[in-house]
Amino acid sequence: MINSPRVCIQVQSVYIEAQSSPDDERYVFAYTVTIRNLGRAPVQLLGRYWLITNGHGRETEVQGEGVVGVQPHIAPGEEYQYTSGAVIETPLGTMQGHYEMIDEKGVAFTIDIPVFRLAVPTLIH
């Protein structure tokens, strides 16, 4: 979990076995992000950046506007949650990144997304 003076980010990931094909080096994961506005003013998420690293150290960068097609406004004391997915070539990897946000005065700020693991459950004891 990462905290800023205004925003808290939590991420949980899960392996999607039914959509994965290990023989084809295709491992599918879903991740759910919860963004909490701990401040006293509304914020808006404008963009995202992800660094996805597979088990061989191969990195893929993904960036774009909003999340899952929206640029959510998050009121003070409220949270926004969404689920998305990632496909990597190995049974173990990581994701990390940041969100680009603005406050009610239009001041831009960046919130780091903590590193989290993408892992097939049978690999982790």
UniProtKB/Swiss-Prot annotation:
HAMAP family listed in its UniProt record: ApaG
Organism: Citrobacter koseri (strain ATCC BAA-895 / CDC 4225-83 / SGSC4696)
A Pfam family annotated for this UniProt entry: DUF525
Gene encoding the protein: apaG
Any GO BP annotation: error-free translesion synthesis
Ranges of residues in domain ApaG: 1-125
Protein name: Protein ApaG
NCBIfam families membership: PRK05461.1 (NF003967)
Transmembrane segments: none
Gene3D superfamilies attached to this UniProt entry: ApaG domain
InterPro entries per record: ApaG_domain (IPR007474), ApaG_sf (IPR036767), Uncharacterised_ApaG (IPR023065)
